Amino acid sequence: MIKNECEKDNQLAARLAKLAGYEKVNGFYKFVNTPEKEMENLGGLLKIVKNLFPDSEEQLLSEYFLELDPNKKCARQSVEYSDINQWDTLTDKIIINLCNSKNSTSQEWGKVYSLHRKLNKNEISLNDAIRESGKCKIKSAEMLFFSNAMLMYAYLNIGEFGLMKSTSKLLEFDDLPEGFIKESFKSRVSMLEANISLNENSLLEARQHSNRAIENSNVNRICFFAYLTIGNTLIFEDYDEAKKAYIKGQKYAKNPVHQEMLDGALCFLSNIWKKENQWVNYNSDNIKYLQLRAFYYINQGNIEEATEILDELSSRDQDENELGFYYYYKGLISQDKTDYYKSIRYFKKSDDKYFIQLPLLQLERMGADLELLNLISI
């Protein structure tokens, strides 16, 4: 398809060659005219596909990735691009190809990404993943790096931000060869570090990490979460700037899950600032979106509807962070300091130093002692 496009436009080949990193257009022509020829650095091909076929990227790359020789570098790079995009079905197929290859490095990549996928699907525990990666006797710099980085996602899922931070210190970018994989790993780690900073209420750092992720990546998923995080850091500070960041993220919300998350962020922002709210999710049974709906009803003065939702949630298995929000919303209805103190307790248990501001601000408005509030928020 790239060859066909170049035949339509004589100047296109030169532009694409430059985009893909070729010093001379002849090298690019050799690639497009030789079906079995693979680019040494997958990043060049990705830029071309995004430039020419932005709406067909997943379909075209899925077909191409599965045709790659699993013994070669390009196939190993393809598993990273597929995984970072969360093209899970494709990723699993590439992993099988790598594991069944004759190349020991490809086999190693297949094993490590297989562990990463099993962790994501909760098919193995963190301890099992650490033990199994140790058995792999990893030799490549890329997989030594990724076998640690993948643990940070698992720690994020269970709210272990301290372990995320200590693991991030094990990551050595200087050991990685220059090219697509290094840049992709940089964008991954930047977003993980942004999550750590947001949790620690280090908002400027969180924005810096997020902007760095955007600079290092053209992956929709990474850019989406980067703008989402930037917006989250601005929730209490500036309604317009937070909304602007979320709207920028809209461009990268390419699947229903991301769109739902974005709508949830806009809903929460509108609730906090008591603005007109067109993002309330009236259909989801997810705890987060039920809580947001209750928050909206509270703002509307529809206490009966809000109470009904919170009563329903009282019998649900909410995690500690969700309980922090739950008791905050209960406090908005009851105006009972006890609910706000419970909210603080659960936000502290979940190590959330950012959203703990919600009950603290309410208690301050109710005349609670500032020194006491500062003490209990530590």
Swiss-Prot record:
Instruction: Give an example GO biological process.
Output: latency-replication decision
A Pfam family this chain is assigned to:
AimR
Description of the deletion phenotype: Knockdown results in decreased AimX transcription and increased lysogeny.
Q: Enumerate the UniProt keywords alphabetically.
A: Activator, Latency-replication decision, Transcription, Transcription regulation
**What InterPro entries does UniProt report for this protein, alphabetically?**
AimR-like (IPR047705), TPR-like_helical_dom_sf (IPR011990)
The reply to whether Transcription regulation figures as a keyword in the UniProt entry is yes
- Could you give the subunit structure recorded for this chain? Homodimer. Interacts with the viral arbitrium peptide, this interaction changes the oligomeric state of AimR from an active dimer to an inactive monomer leading to lysogeny.
Function, as annotated, reads:
Transcriptional regulator which is part of the latency-replication switch system that decides at the onset of infection whether to replicate and lyse the host or to lysogenize (latency) and keep the host viable. Activates the transcription of the aimX locus. Transcriptional activation of aimX seems to lead to the productive viral replication (lytic cycle), aimX possibly acting as a regulatory non-coding RNA.
Protein name as catalogued: AimR transcriptional regulator
**Organism, scientific name:** Bacillus phage phi3T
Encoding gene (name): aimR
